[in-house]
Amino acid sequence: MRNIISILIRNEAGALARVANLFSSRAYNIDSLSVAPTDDQSVSRITLVTFGSQDILDQIIKQTRKLIDVISIIDMTDDDYHEREFALIKIEVGSISNDNLNLLMDNYGATILSEKDNFYTLEIISSSEKVDEFIGAITAKIPIDSIVRSGALAIAKGKPLLQKNS
């Protein structure tokens, strides 16, 4: 099962490493990970995606809560939330007709960010599922030179689920 976990941690050296080590020590793979400061520079938000059983995930969440730098943690999987992922994809100009490329980009809301040295850099911001679909649609037609992805970002709809003072 795919799980999206959101964690507020103190923005201090080693805090992220302690969280990652906890997952690693339990042989629980992190599929994607994004970390950045919140509006309060002393607090960072970790958004991570992992796959696995609910029992193991529940155990890891309980143990993560005990880490000294963790302020709060929640499994957002069953909540109502917005999810976005950002990807940059580099392809060679002329490897696909402009009409076909434009049709693909229109279908997924992607854009051409730049054209330089006979390469396009494409940009897409969507759900992880749609980003995967777009990459699949592109690779079905042409080779991708390079790709970089942000990993999933998620935030609850409505009232915040994570509290900085918990």
Language-model features, listed with the residues they occupy:
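Long, contiguous binding/interaction regions
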Residues: 1-4, 8-44, 49-166
